[in-house]
């Protein structure tokens, strides 16, 4: 993937505006985070995780997005008030797996997010508690 420097905070803000989700998303992000990664792949990755967070959290809850920069990588957390069962958790990145069979979708979003993260040289993980779920991506910026 060809890298091009862009502002990650701006990219995520744009995704939130496109979904008309400003009232449901709270961003805790530095204003200017320029990263040298593939723009289209990063945009698709963040779109999948934002959409997933909005889709699987209670209707009037707030999705939180936090960007944490360091010298070698950038970490982005997508935090929502939905939960994932302990039985479901190990399978969320499997193709065609859907934890909630009544929700729309084909079970391809999170597996694609995992592939995009790996293509960008990063890591993705998920953790859940009884009150929230956090998807974390860590991407290299060197």
Predicted regions and their residues:
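Short alpha-helical Gxxx[C/S/T] motif in the catalytic ATP-binding
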Residues: 109, 113
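A conserved beta-strand-to-alpha-helix junction within the catalytic ATP-binding
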Residues: 2-17
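Short conserved segment of the HATPase_c
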Residues: 84-96
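Conserved catalytic submotifs in the C-terminal HATPase_c
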Residues: 4, 24-36, 71
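Short beta-strand/loop element within the Bergerat-fold HATPase_c
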Residues: 60-72
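Short helix-loop "hinge" at the ATP-lid/N-box region of the Bergerat-fold HATPase_c
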Residues: 53-54
């Amino acid at each position: 993937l060809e890298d091009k420097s862009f502002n990650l905070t701006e990219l995520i803000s744009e995704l939130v505006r496109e979904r008309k989700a400003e009232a449901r998303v709270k961003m805790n992000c530095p204003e200017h985070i320029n990263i040298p990664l593939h723009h289209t792949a990063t945009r698709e990755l963040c779109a999948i995780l934002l959409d997933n967070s909005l889709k699987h959290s209670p209707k009037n809850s707030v999705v939180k997005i936090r960007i944490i920069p360091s010298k070698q990588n950038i970490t982005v957390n997508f935090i929502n008030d939905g939960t994932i069962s302990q039985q479901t958790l190990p399978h969320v990145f499997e193709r065609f797996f859907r934890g909630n069979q009544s929700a729309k979708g084909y079970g391809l979003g999170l597996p694609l997010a995992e592939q995009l993260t790996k293509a960008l040289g990063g890591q993705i993980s998920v953790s859940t508690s009884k009150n929230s779920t956090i998807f974390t991506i860590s991407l290299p910026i060197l």
